[in-house]
Amino acid sequence: MSRGIAFLMGCLLASDLFAAEVDLMGARSCGKWIEERRMENSTREMNRVPALITKSWFLGYLSGRAEATRRNFLKGTDSDSIFLWLDNYCRANPNKGLDSGGVDLARELMQMKGIRP
């Protein structure tokens, strides 16, 4: 009996380990995104590189969310629309991270397309 209780307690304690937040690598703040977007119009090619890197990261992040959730919320959505949405989101939320924007955009796209979360 006590072995069974110990086993159940171990399972319950271990489940808390899996409930922890995941650290995201490469996520930038919205304030940094706005700054990079301003530099994107520069005549110096090197000034445009950070925005290109962040765009690639964000599209990868969204694609990863779509794959992980098995919800094809990106279907029919073009990159320009995604970046316009992100520009508006980041102007309104400069202290948030792009990962938070990705979560909100995914939720909004699923709602618009009638996809259950």
Residue positions per predicted region:
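N-terminal Sec-dependent export signals
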Residues: 1-2, 23
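Short N-proximal segments of mature Sec-exported proteins
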Residues: 20-88
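C-terminal partner/receptor-binding element of secreted or periplasmic proteins
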Residues: 94-117
